[in-house]
A protein has these predicted regions:
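Surface loop/turn signatures of beta-propeller and other carbohydrate-active proteins
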Residues: 10-65, 101-133, 163-202, 228-262
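Single conserved hydrophobic/aromatic residue that forms the stacking wall/gate
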Residues: 279-288
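Intrinsically disordered, low-complexity linker/loop segments enriched in Gly/Pro
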Residues: 138-148, 155-158, 171-175
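Bacterial Sec-dependent signal peptides at the C-terminal "C-region" and cleavage site
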Residues: 1-10
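Hydrophobic core segments of beta-strands in well-ordered, beta-rich domains
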Residues: 62-84, 128-149, 187-220, 260-261, ...
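Beta-propeller blade signature
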Residues: 91-99, 154-161, 218-224, 282
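Short consensus segments that form the blades of beta-propeller domains
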Residues: 52-54, 81-88, 121-123, 147-148, ...
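Short, His- and charge-rich active-site/binding loops that engage polyanionic ligands
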Residues: 73-74, 82-99
Length: 288
């Protein structure tokens, strides 16, 4: 049996962390942003058959990991093919750093929609929002969103060097005879553990474990890190582990972030909490 621990403190206790929490984060001064859009990096898109300024509009929602002693950041980049996030094409860029603040970037994306088996699910919206974790034997597993501008699907890819990737398709394609294939889903956080200074993918009771979801937090298990089975209730509906809370910073959505971490005090999951734009009628200063 596993449990997820997440913060419940209100805005009045925002600096008081429980003893299980990770805290003390600080924003380095005068270094941000560390990766920004660039107009002059071109990429020949195999689908449009044209040279694209692939990272000219946005660079955001990155994943970070270690490879050969360097920090590697895989970041989502959007071109200027449309207006508004999600209406352009996303590809994943590759950047390295030895200090965490100064980065060297590849000129071409390392992961993108192509003339492959995933084209129908990734074009024209692209490949979005990577989360990366690694096994003890050095296999990098990336959860990302396939976006064809109809249904966002949580998908899996693997690599040994973070540049050459094998796409495995939607994470839930085979679960329950394909019941969740057309489910809109994203944001997969695979469970990890810090072992001798390395953050590695961990099994629970012989299975890999993943938290996922954008509006609510759900969970899934896997035997091979490729095919995932969502955890469901007795009636077959998805089991919600936690959801948005009225009157808090996460009143609109609770979206899984980087890989969850198993600790002696429980599993720590960092998530993106977004509040509604409404104002509580009895407290005009509090978002609801």
């Amino acid at each position: 049996m596993t449990c997820t621990i997440h913060g419940q403190s209100s805005q009045h206790k925002e600096n008081q962390l429980p003893d299980w929490a990770f805290g003390g984060f600080e924003r380095p001064k005068n270094v941000n942003p560390v990766i920004s859009p660039i107009e002059n990096t071109k990429f020949y898109c195999p689908l449009t058959k044209d040279s694209i300024a692939w990272e000219s509009n946005d660079t955001f929602n990155p994943a970070a990991t270690l490879y050969n002693g360097e920090i590697v950041v895989l970041y989502r980049a959007e071109d200027k093919s449309g207006v508004g996030i999600g209406h352009r094409t996303s590809r994943l860029g590759y950047a390295t750093s030895t200090d965490g603040t100064h980065f060297k970037r590849e000129k071409a994306p390392v992961f993108y929609p192509d003339t492959d088996s995933q084209k129908e699910l990734e074009w024209p919206g692209g490949c979005e929002d990577p989360r990366v974790a690694v096994t003890e034997d050095g296999l990098y597993v990336m959860m990302y969103t396939q976006w064809n501008r109809h249904i966002p699907r949580l998908a899996v890819a693997t690599s040994r060097n973070l540049k050459e990737w094998t796409k495995h398709g939607p994470a839930f394609a085979k679960a329950y005879d394909g019941k969740f294939f057309n489910l809109g889903c994203k944001s997969g956080s695979i469970l990890t553990e810090v072992v001798k200074g390395k953050q590695l993918i961990k099994k629970i009771n012989g299975k890999y474990f993943m938290y996922w979801g954008e509006e609510h937090v759900f969970a899934a298990t896997s035997d091979d890190l490729i095919n995932w089975t969502p955890i469901v209730n007795i009636d077959g509906s998805l089991k919600k582990l936690f959801s948005p809370r009225d009157g808090y910073f996460d009143s609109h959505l609770t979206e899984c972030g980087p890989p969850a971490i198993y600790t002696p005090k429980g599993i720590v999951l960092l998530y993106n909490g977004k509040n509604l734009s409404l104002i509580h009628i009895s407290e005009p200063t509090r978002p609801y």
